[in-house]
Amino acid sequence: MRKIDGLKFLQKNFPDLTVDCLFVDKVENLDESQLEKSKLWRVRGGRTIGSELNLPQGTFSDKNELKKFMKEQKQKDRNMEFVIHRVSPEYFSAPFVGTLAVYNKGDRPGIKIELQEVTKELVNSIDKGKRPRDWEASLILDYEFLSKAPKVLKKSSNLNMDFLKYPIVVIHEIGEQIFDLYEKNGREEETYTRFNIYDLGQVLLDDHRSKESFMEKYKFIPSPVITTEFKKRKIIEKDQEL
């Protein structure tokens, strides 16, 4: 599944937990009124056909610069399409990133959560070709055969599990729902969904692929989290011992 198609899947099925997405095929079809939701725009490109590796991306606070970037990229590659994330400064400050793997194929169905802690050294390593998903994991949880209680394959000693407990419950629940969606449609899939965890335990489904995703100039002071009914239900329904 292409990156942009993956974002469309997540936005459709998990709208409250997926990074805001505005999909645009070309700058001429961009409705500027739709940008008013924020004053900061993260844009990424994806080809309608072929590989999506090493595609252009950028962050803008000026609409004209954003449009110029999109126009230039479209001129270079007519197969280019775009997704614009209308974000706030806190988007760039995730202390944890990770991967949710869902295995709905073969004879060993399961879910695996792998978590990486963000450090300045690791962020700098992105310039050397080491993506966040390539960073050494701080925590690996394996829900083999869809077990409710995970097998802890790895856990760094300095992790604050009291803080991580709730986000992990939410992420695991997402994994179960992804499995059920494919099961319902009769599809055997092996999917990998990237996520971010923020300072107050918020979970955001997205893929931070570049150093710019962690730009220090966008650091922020956290504001209170509005607990949605989805989140309240997860707290009440699940109490996972890690």
Where do the language-model regions lie?
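Nucleotide/phosphate-binding sheet-loop regions of phosphoryl- and nucleotidyl-transfer enzymes
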Residues: 1-242
